[in-house]
Amino acid sequence: MRIAKVRGTVVSTYKEPSLQGVKFLVVQFLDEAGQALQEYEVAADMVGAGVDEWVLISRGSQARHVRDCQERPVDAAVIAIIDTVNVENRSVYDKREHS
Amino acid sequence: MRIAKVRGTVVSTYKEPSLQGVKFLVVQFLDEAGQALQEYEVAADMVGAGVDEWVLISRGSQARHVRDCQERPVDAAVIAIIDTVNVENRSVYDKREHS
Amino acid sequence: MRIAKVRGTVVSTYKEPSLQGVKFLVVQFLDEAGQALQEYEVAADMVGAGVDEWVLISRGSQARHVRDCQERPVDAAVIAIIDTVNVENRSVYDKREHS
Amino acid sequence: MRIAKVRGTVVSTYKEPSLQGVKFLVVQFLDEAGQALQEYEVAADMVGAGVDEWVLISRGSQARHVRDCQERPVDAAVIAIIDTVNVENRSVYDKREHS
Amino acid sequence: MRIAKVRGTVVSTYKEPSLQGVKFLVVQFLDEAGQALQEYEVAADMVGAGVDEWVLISRGSQARHVRDCQERPVDAAVIAIIDTVNVENRSVYDKREHS
């Protein structure tokens, strides 16, 4: 999985029928120190993440093991909203300090 | 998924039998600000996107969860025609301004 | 999928039993203008493409949806021999001009 | 698979229900000489690896063939804790020298 | 698939139970001219390749279609030991000249 930050949304009315009701978020990947990378993805969000929240993104066919996405053509999904990231016993991110 | 712009078509008569009737589009990936990237893909299109339209592309085995593609060897598909893209509450793209 | 040009062959006698009879082609990926990229792949060929022909390559688990490859450990396959490639209403490639 | 070193943890309370009880590790990929690469991944850990241990990471849909992960949306998992790495008959890593 | 050269081994005692008896090889990818690339992978080997042999590597979920790997979390596998590689009717590699 990858760590990412929610940056925006994509809206589409004309789409695969199975995608009705699926929310699409624009997410930007972060490195292990929390620095933004020049890498973006559009991910299906069934967890309910908000802009600026840190999330875990799962990609490829595994993305469909998110609730209600089994038969949907999504190749990236938000699987968790991150509380904390620790690297070498140092806190890189703590959600409480960002709310 | 990735944001892309439709740029052209690929036509093939001599192909896997299961691909009869599948339309192939040449798409160019865009970054989150709508700038063209030097990355192209050929995607199966069951949604009916036109040249210059912004679309969402799903890749890998998930591409086959598009209608009628279950048993087809496609690894990239158009899953939606994009209406709007918003990043940090700023409109990056609105289809109505491009029609 | 990706556009590629057939460049050569790989032969192997000592291999997974399920691969008996599968032909392996060395293909070089092309960009949307038909320029050769420094990216190669070895693809299973059930379509019968020849050296210098332009082909469509499908990669990942989708490659096995090519005829007779369901249970074979191939992660790249030729799915079509290309007739034409058009980008922004300009012909990039036409097979008849290359035969 | 890829060789990696465990560098930290990610904790999330608000996540896909199927992910309850799954431990997430931040791992950094290493090259064949054991040098750290600027590539990070978050992997599910069902093996019980500790910080600084060298591990084998499997990615993509194969990651779910780890115990208890069949229906979980994980796209990267720790599949083994490495004892030794040898390249060209030279020892690159031996766990006993690092405990 | 990718062409690679066997460079070494990884040994692990503490691993996913399903991986008992699986041999892990360190392989280095080669370009179409046989030049070594700075890209390494650890692949499961059910074919019995030796150090310095040229092999074909299949990656992603297709790797599990190698014998006895159906339910194993391997995302890369040796599927063939290469006899010859020809590019543009020129011999790039012939196993007999290397034994």
Curated annotation (Swiss-Prot), chains A, B, C, D, E:
Gene3D superfamilies: EutN/Ccml. Keywords: Bacterial microcompartment, Carbon dioxide fixation, Carboxysome, Photosynthesis. Induction: Carboxysome size and components vary with growth conditions. When grown in ambient air at medium light (50 uE meter(-2) second(-1)) there are 7.4 units of this protein per carboxysome, the numbers are stable under low light, and increase under high light and high CO(2) (at protein level). It holds the Pfam family EutN_CcmL. It is found in: Carboxysome. The keyword Transport does not apply. Residues 1-83 form the BMV domain. GO terms for biological process: carbon fixation; photosynthesis. One of its GO terms (cellular component) is carboxysome. Signal peptide: none annotated. Disruption phenotype: An insertion in this gene leads to rod-shaped carboxysomes and an inability to grow in normal air, called a high-CO(2) requiring phenotype, HCR. When ccmL-ccmM-ccmN-ccmO are deleted no carboxysomes form, cells are HCR and RuBisCO is soluble. Both mutants grow on 2% CO(2). Heterologous expression of 12 carboxysomal genes in E.coli (ccaA, ccmK2, ccmK3, ccmK4, ccmL, ccmM, ccmN, ccmO, ccmP, rbcL, rbcS, rbcX) leads to the formation of bodies that resemble carboxysomes, have densely packed paracrystalline arrays and RuBisCO activity. These structures open the door to generating carboxysomes in plant cells to increase their photosynthesis and productivity, as well as tailoring bacterial microcompartments to specific metabolic needs and molecule delivery. GO terms for molecular function: structural constituent of carboxysome shell. It comes from the Bacteria. Probably forms vertices in the carboxysome, a polyhedral inclusion where RuBisCO (ribulose bisphosphate carboxylase, rbcL-rbcS) is sequestered. Has been modeled to induce curvature upon insertion into an otherwise flat hexagonal molecular layer of CcmK subunits. PANTHER family: BACTERIAL MICROCOMPARTMENT SHELL VERTEX PROTEIN EUTN, ETHANOLAMINE UTILIZATION PROTEIN EUTN. Belongs to the CcmL/EutN family. CcmL subfamily. Homopentamer. Interacts with full-length CcmM. The tight homopentamer forms a pore with an opening of about 5 Angstroms in diameter which opens into a wider tunnel at the base of the truncated pyramid. The pore is positively charged. This is Carboxysome shell vertex protein CcmL. It comes from Synechococcus elongatus (strain ATCC 33912 / PCC 7942 / FACHB-805) (Anacystis nidulans R2). The gene is ccmL.
